[in-house]
Structures are given as C-alpha cells and as structure tokens.
Amino acid sequence: MTTLYITHPAGLQHIPPAGHPERPDRLRVIERVLEHESFSTLARDQAPAAPFHRIALCHPMDYIEAIQDASPVEGLVRLDADTSMSPGTFEAALRSAGGAVMAVDEVMTGKVNNAFCAMRPPGHHAEKASPMGFCFFNNAAIAARHAQNHYGAERAAIIDFDVHHGNGTQDIFWADPTVMYCSTHEMPLYPGTGAVSERGEHNNIVNAPLRAGDGGDEFEQAFETVILPRLRDFRPDLVIISAGFDAHLRDPLANINLLEPDYIWVTRKLMEVADQCANGRVVSLLEGGYDLQGLGRSVAVHVTALMRG
C-alpha cells in the first residue's frame, strides 16, 4: 500500500499574530514526526499552487481576487477576529488548496492508494465567499469538486472529525446531493453550527455533535450508529477526510478527550468504507490540532494507519 505525504515550505510563511494557535510550528512538528524511519516508505511530494480556476470550483472568482488583493506587502491584515493575512499567506493558501488537488490526482489515477496533505492554512470554515476561523479556501470542498469535474466521480464523501464544525463545507454542499458531508464536533462550540437538525436540502449533511467531556466511547458510538451507516448507504467514489486533531485530550481549544487509539480506529473505519465503496481511495487533509505534542502523536498514528490499513 502506497501513501503519499504532501507538504510545502510555503505553509510556514503564513504568519499569524503572536500567540495565535494556528501557527507554523504545527507543520514543523508534523515534518519532524514523519521524518522518523518508520515512515521511510512514504511517498513524498510538494504541494503546487492551485490555479484560480480550480479554487473557483467552490469559490467565486471575485472572492479569490479579493483575498489576493487583501494580501499585505508587510505586516498583518486582519480579515476577521481570528483570520489574518501576512505577506506569505496567499501563496500558502494557494498551495494548501493545490495540495488537496494533487492528492486527488494521485489517488484517482491510482498512482498511490491514499494521501495525507499537511498544509496550512486549513480550510473547513471557509464558506463560498467568506474567510473564517483561520481559513481562506475550502480545501476539502475543492478536492471533492475536482474529483467530480476532472475524474467523473459521481459521489464524494467528506468526513470531518475536527472538534469544530466545518460550517464552510456544509455551506458549500448544502444543496448538493452528490456530496455527503459528515461531522463529529463539540457542541456548543465555535462556529455554532452543526446541529443534528441541519441535514441539507437532500439529506446529504450528517451532523453527530459531541458534548464537552465526551471521549473515545462517545466518538466511536457517533460513527458506528450515525456516520458509518450513512456513508455505506451513500457509497462514495472517494473518501475525503477533514483531519482535524483538536478533539485530542491535550488540545487547548476544546473539551473532547480523544487519544491516539481513537484516531487509529476512525482512520481504519473510514478506510474500510473506502475499500468497500471507493476502491480504497482516501484523501486526508489537515485541518486543526493546536497542542503540538497531541498533534504530532495523532498525525503519526493517522498516517501509520493510512500506510498499513
């Protein structure tokens, strides 16, 4: 089984304000972890910059250009309370989306079995025409649309286990029966969306919120009783994971208590669905995860599971 690891140094050049949790050290710790000899068989590549027409599969062109125009020559530009741009942010965002596109290309053509893209900024809070929650372009949504438009995938599934609900992904696919979006997340918590009652126009949105203090048992129950049955019924041609690791016990931004075995378990379960429905095709894209030790450990077991099944 071949797993591709995609990253790029440009991801380090998106510089947030001092003390911001979504910081370059996140990619540095992932790089250090994946340099270990146990990952020597990983295929590796660098994320290209996504062309505007690929990003425009999910975002209006005038929005893309507005983000480009907002890019500062020096210093920081704040777009909302949580989301700022430095001079390197726009290229990093293009390559974050481009890494997602590359992952789809490599998986859909059968060059690799699956792929993990570790880039920043993340994407799942970005709505069609709104940056939000550290996010500019919705990488998972772009990946799904690219698989459909370029490779003829009839159905794509995005499974999001970040502790924050992916309001942007839900927004983009709310009225699209060809994409299923499934999410576990703490509720109530930022951004305030993700209730069970939010189902989409075609019942293609599956929200399974968790409560503060929940851990692996509740997480696995949400998948076993809600998400996995819906995924199997949907029979996706591609499984895309919005891989946020901020539901880890150590994470400072939330109150869910997952540990490394929980991330192994969910990765294997999603690979089983992909094996049953999608010829094993899995694309995993980094979202959140803000405790560096918890992030490094979680990514290590997630990628190990992708490599070994």
Task: List the predicted regions and their residue ranges.
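HDAC/HDAC-like amidohydrolase catalytic core signature
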Residues: 1-159, 164-309
